[in-house]
Amino acid sequence: MSSQQTSSALPPVFVALDMNEGAVSPLLGTLDGLNVGYKIGMELFYQSGADLVRRMAQDHAIFLDLKLHDIPNTVQSAAARIADMGVRVTTVHAAGGGAMLAGLPALERDDFQFLAVTVLTSMKAEDLRGLGVSDDNPQNRVQHLFNLARDNGITGFICSPLEVEGLHAELPSGTFITPGVRPAGASLDDQNRVATPLQAKQSGATSLVIGRPITRAPDPRAAAQDRK
């Protein structure tokens, strides 16, 4: 039994596959039958490529997280290739600008959507200062990038659990996927702006991204069902 969705609804959790390809199949077997999707990021994609993405997309809801950020023509071409892989959602950096974002909504379908990345959940005020951002408040930066993406037709967003409530209130019909989710008592690892799964869902998150608290848990199947 696969975890593929029977409609355009996204699964409540995407399990982050930040691992080598050899570790993927055992984990899929452990989580078989659960209503989860899988996030394929740079580590796994650069090891195994588009073939793995296409194979997994036949049976599972896939979130391809490559955070496209380049000149508009390059991003448009890459995005068109991704749209044909069968994935459900994929990411672009909102900081790429309006010209980069504006052409993407035309590539969306009922079962495929772009998500604008605002501020990474690992970033703090000091990190923004290091980038030369004049307003180093992460929430203000998130709001600015949210406005930019929304004004260019993007309705899906990646944001931390701390910002999702306010953004969801501004765009109730939007898609909001939140990384930086840690069950109560779990290690924060390299995340800074975090919340529990229950807090994130109550704040308006459409789906959660959870990696190490599931993949490195003694019982990954039980961890994948922990929504507290």
Predicted regions and their residues:
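Acidic (Asp/Glu)-rich catalytic clusters
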Residues: 4-7, 26-33, 51-59, 80-84, ...
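Alpha-helix N-cap and loop-to-helix initiation/capping positions
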Residues: 23, 130-141, 188-195, 219-223
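Conserved anion-binding
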Residues: 12-13, 70, 74-156, 160-165, ...
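N-terminal basic/disordered segments at the start of proteins
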Residues: 9, 13-21
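Hydrophobic beta-strand scaffold residues
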Residues: 62-63, 114, 176, 208
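Glycine-rich phosphate-binding active-site loops on the catalytic face of alpha/beta enzymes
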Residues: 85-100, 190-223
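Conserved, mostly hydrophobic/aromatic
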Residues: 15, 38, 67, 90, ...
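Metabolite-binding pocket within alpha/beta catalytic cores that recognizes anionic/polar moieties
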Residues: 37-89
